């Protein structure tokens, strides 16, 4: 029903910071240092390092990459989205259990005053994080092939190696409980050390106005974090923060059930996709 990946918070432009030349080099170093800290073992250390310098983003982006104003805006939205998500994930208090599956997959939720209700999927996957990153980022447009909750994902624009704007169309829900929805999202994909981050938020793009017969939903904050398991580097601790406004007159009880179940379903579909990929590789090697 929903794009099975990652989208996220509200970006802030900070236009007044763009021309502060002296901050550009320091901003770039600081942001990269903060994200490297996220790959460390202690989740509580994420926040103190990530919150501080969001106001320095635009000057380093424009100077170092040479992007135009629209591209800078997309990159900033993705960067801010990542910071907002990590802040939410770093706060371990106040989470309520929604689902605990038989295999240990867990969905938690929390209500935030500036965001609304957010959901957090926590699973352990028998895959290396590098392989998962390739599937979810490198093969993003193939998601509709293996996830029935997603009809289509299309990349509208790429900005550098870490930012893209996408259009996603949701798949049908059982009984058509929730009608067709689509999303235009900016996505930020980063790898720092052995940890992978996939974040995003709703945005607008001139090539994809609202479509007739489809409700344009909004998402954010959303982020996937993939870290090797401390017990086995061939397994991945997979966390997915999800926040979506489906729009329309849908009872909250239905929305909550649909969103939490969507996360559980996504984990199962992803496992099956990766298992199928492994079989295909083994068959190719045997030929």
From Swiss-Prot:
Known catalytic reactions: cholesterol(in) = cholesterol(out)
Keyword Mitochondrion in annotation: yes
One Gene Ontology term of the molecular function aspect: cholesterol binding
Pfam families: START
Domain START span(s) in chain numbering: 66-279
The keyword Mitochondrion belongs to this UniProt entry's keyword annotation: yes
Cellular component per GO, a single term: mitochondrion
Pathway recorded for this protein: Steroid metabolism; cholesterol metabolism
Organism superkingdom: Eukaryota
Keywords on record: Lipid transport, Lipid-binding, Mitochondrion, Steroidogenesis, Transit peptide, Transport
Transit peptide, residues from-to: 1-61
Assembly, per entry: May interact with TSPO.
Function: Plays a key role in steroid hormone synthesis by enhancing the metabolism of cholesterol into pregnenolone. Mediates the transfer of cholesterol from the outer mitochondrial membrane to the inner mitochondrial membrane where it is cleaved to pregnenolone.
Name of the protein in its database record: Steroidogenic acute regulatory protein, mitochondrial
Source organism of the structure: Oncorhynchus mykiss
């Amino acid at each position: 029903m929903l794009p099975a990946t990652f989208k996220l918070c509200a970006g802030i432009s900070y236009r007044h910071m763009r021309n502060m030349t002296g901050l550009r080099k320091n901003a770039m170093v600081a942001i990269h240092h903060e994200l490297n800290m996220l790959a460390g073992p202690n989740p509580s250390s994420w926040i103190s390092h990530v919150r501080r310098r969001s106001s320095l983003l635009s000057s380093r982006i424009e100077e170092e990459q040479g992007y135009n104003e629209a591209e800078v805006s997309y990159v900033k939205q993705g960067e801010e989205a990542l910071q907002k998500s990590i802040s939410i994930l770093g706060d371990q208090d106040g989470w309520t259990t929604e689902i605990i599956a038989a295999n240990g997959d867990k969905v938690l939720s929390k209500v935030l005053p500036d965001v609304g209700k957010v959901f957090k999927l926590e699973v352990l996957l028998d895959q290396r994080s590098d392989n998962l990153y390739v599937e979810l980022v490198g093969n993003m447009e193939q998601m509709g092939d293996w996830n029935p909750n997603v009809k289509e994902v299309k990349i509208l624009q790429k900005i550098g190696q870490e930012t893209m704007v996408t259009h996603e169309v949701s798949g049908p829900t059982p009984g058509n409980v929730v009608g067709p929805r689509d999303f235009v999202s900016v996505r930020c994909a980063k790898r720092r050390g052995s940890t992978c981050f996939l974040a995003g938020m709703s945005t607008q793009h001139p090539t994809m106005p609202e479509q007739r017969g489809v409700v344009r939903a909004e998402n954010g904050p959303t982020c996937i974090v993939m870290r090797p398991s401390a017990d086995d580097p061939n397994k991945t601790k997979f966390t997915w923060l999800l926040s979506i406004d489906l729009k329309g007159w849908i009872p909250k009880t239905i929305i909550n059930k649909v969103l939490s179940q969507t996360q559980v379903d996504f984990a199962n579909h992803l496992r099956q996709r990766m298992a199928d990929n492994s079989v295909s590789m083994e068959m190719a090697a045997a030929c």
